[in-house]
A protein has these predicted regions:
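Accessory, non-ATPase domains that flank or precede helicase/AAA+ motor cores in DNA-metabolism machines
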Residues: 1-260
Length: 260
């Protein structure tokens, strides 16, 4: 072998050296022998919540780095069976600690595998994307994000203003009771608007009782906040639609999510 070629090969091997162990959640059934977190090798630590592509048997699947690696997470000597991660979806922000805590609670409560619940909570189409495909999707231009207020506001009635003030007075659940046409939706709109004005990083989740009611409510929210700020997520959408909405919400581009 030419000395120059040998030198290049040595540099590549050094770059790909597995110097860290990652604990990764993958989609396996609770009764499987692989139901817990799986260990993979990586060149460097990755933040918890990072989405990665990992080998699983003869397949390559999506996984989630679950725990921060301990200080002694270096790959022990003499462990050639530790498989390396195949890729990192570095263009996608890690799934935050609150999301991971909710998934862990659901897995314990329903006695399911952690990865089984975690991966099922992500859009189905996301599970098939590699790093290059994800980068291309995120480079696609999205809808412009206008200001929080896009329509002229109507004056609230005394009852509506009272309900709005009570909701802002303290945290906790509230029941807004009123007959059809009494103006409940406008109170919801104002409360969401107040939240988004008060905290530039805040997002609002609005739950709708039925899928067929979503388009009508979405029209109201889009008229108030703009199309780039509002997305819907429900089982009546196609996989590409669900992925597009999820990416907009996860990236913070969409600040309001309508769900069922």
């Amino acid at each position: 072998m030419h000395p120059e070629a040998s030198k290049k090969l040595e540099v590549r091997q050094a770059d790909e050296a597995l110097s860290c162990t990652l604990q990764v959640a993958v989609q396996t059934p609770a009764h499987s022998a692989l139901a817990g977190l799986l260990s993979y090798g990586a060149p460097a630590p990755l933040p918890p919540g990072t989405l990665v592509r990992v080998p699983l048997g003869t397949r390559e699947v999506l996984g989630i780095v679950w725990d921060a690696p301990p200080p002694d997470a270096a790959v022990p000597a003499g462990m050639p069976e530790l498989r390396p991660i195949a890729g990192v979806l570095a263009d996608l922000a890690p799934l935050d600690a609150h999301w991971r805590a909710l998934v862990a609670f659901a897995a314990r409560y329903y006695q399911r595998g952690l990865g089984e619940v975690a991966l099922a909570a992500l859009p189905a189409q996301l599970r098939g994307l590699g790093p290059a495909q994800m980068a291309r999707r995120l480079r696609r231009p999205g809808s412009p994000a206008p200001g929080v207020e896009t329509t002229e506001l109507i004056a609230l009635s005394e009852e509506q203003e009272s309900a709005r003030a009570q909701i802002h007075s303290k945290t906790g659940p509230f029941l807004l009771f009123g007959s059809t046409g009494s103006g409940k939706t406008e109170v919801y709109l104002r409360c969401v608007q107040d939240l988004l004005h008060a905290d530039p990083g805040a997002q609002a989740l609005v739950m709708v009782p039925e899928i067929n009611l979503t388009p009508q409510l979405q029209e109201r929210f889009v008229a108030r906040f703009g199309a780039g700020q509002v997305v819907a997520l429900h089982s009546g959408m196609t996989n590409p639609q669900r992925l597009k909405s999820w990416l907009a919400a996860h990236s913070g581009q969409a600040r309001i999510v309508l769900g069922t």
